[in-house]
A protein has these predicted regions:
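Gly/Ser/Thr-enriched, mixed-charge loops and adjacent short helices
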Residues: 1-80
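Proline/glycine-rich low-complexity loops and linkers
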Residues: 1-8, 99-159
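Active-site flanking residues adjacent to catalytic metal/cofactor-binding acidic residues
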Residues: 25-28, 88-90, 128
Length: 159
């Protein structure tokens, strides 16, 4: 999977290497502790400040990537002088970013920011769950594409 990411035309590995990013990560002791550091190293990031990257499944804090659960990485951002922080949930299907000042750039904004970049270069339709922000719909329509909302899978499975 990492090689597939590196092969994407939208990923400028040389620019990432040249930027000399200092990156903090919190992988909540999930499988993200394996793939996230490996991906960052493959992208040329040399300084990675790791929190909770042992994938044993014993979460050191509530794994929901919301500000009140991310105080440790927010503090690390300042101490390490990191440029950006990444936090994943246990199954690594959600990503939150932490800005250099320790403030969370929420997962909803992350999705919309990435979608805006991708759609600018490779137009296409988008889909997200019903609990997502309307901003993805708005960005998708900005590029003349169609947006669809889908039921939240876990909720549907429980019902």
């Amino acid at each position: 999977h990492i090689q597939s990411v590196l092969n994407l035309d939208l990923v400028d590995v040389e620019a990432i290497k040249a930027a000399n990013f200092r990156v903090a990560i919190d992988c909540v002791n999930s499988v993200g502790g394996i793939v996230i550091p490996d991906l960052l190293y493959a992208l040329g990031v040399k300084e990675i400040f790791k929190l909770h990257c042992a994938p044993h499944g014993n979460f050191s804090h509530n794994p929901e990537p919301i500000p009140e659960n991310l105080t440790e990485i927010s503090d690390l951002m300042g101490h390490a002088k990191a440029d950006v922080g990444f936090v994943v949930d246990p199954d690594v299907d959600r990503l939150a970013m932490i800005c250099e000042n320790g403030v969370m750039y929420g997962e909803e904004y992350t999705l919309v920011t990435v979608a805006d970049y991708v759609l600018k270069h490779t137009p296409g339709n988008t889909v997200s769950n019903l609990s997502s922000t309307r901003a993805l719909r708005d960005v998708t329509r900005k590029y003349g594409m169609e947006y669809s909302a889908s039921a939240v899978v876990v909720k549907v499975m429980v019902e």
